[in-house]
């Protein structure tokens, strides 16, 4: 009986660690892509667009921290969606929730430079598919909850 309790406890702890590691790695994956895409590849487009509006592009450390929180929340949503969906289904829902809705809002506010979308759309799709893959790979030993 003691052995089975330890075994169950160890399995539970292993599962929790697997989930947390999946979330951490996928969050880092998304954060790296966001930084490279927006702060390196498309930085001039963002800066020019904001300058044309008479604004400075928000690039203070606190802005980066908020984007880190956004990435974490997106990955947590992916984690729960992945329990019931396959790779492409989960990625499609997560991409719409995380990116399409964001672009609609910031586009409506006039702060989205539309010229970035030909690069941002496919890149963000790869980004989300990669995050879903990471989450599913690390969760592969954890049974999914089918309805």
Give, region by region, the residue ranges found by the protein language model.
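Juxtamembrane/disordered regions of integral membrane proteins
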Residues: 5, 12-147
């Amino acid at each position: 009986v003691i052995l089975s309790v330890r075994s169950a406890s160890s399995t539970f702890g292993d599962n929790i660690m697997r989930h947390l590691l999946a979330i951490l790695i996928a969050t880092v994956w998304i954060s790296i892509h966001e930084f490279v895409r927006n702060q390196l590849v498309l930085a001039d487009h963002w800066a020019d667009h904001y300058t044309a509006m008479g604004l400075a592009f928000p690039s203070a450390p606190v802005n980066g921290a908020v984007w880190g929180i956004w990435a974490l929340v997106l990955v947590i949503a992916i984690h729960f969606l992945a329990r019931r969906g396959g790779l492409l289904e989960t990625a499609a829902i997560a991409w719409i929730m995380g990116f399409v809705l964001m672009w609609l809002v910031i586009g409506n506010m006039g702060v989205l430079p539309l010229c970035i979308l030909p690069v941002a759309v496919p890149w963000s799709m790869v980004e989300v598919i990669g995050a879903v893959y990471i989450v599913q790979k690390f969760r592969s030993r954890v049974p999914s909850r089918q309805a």
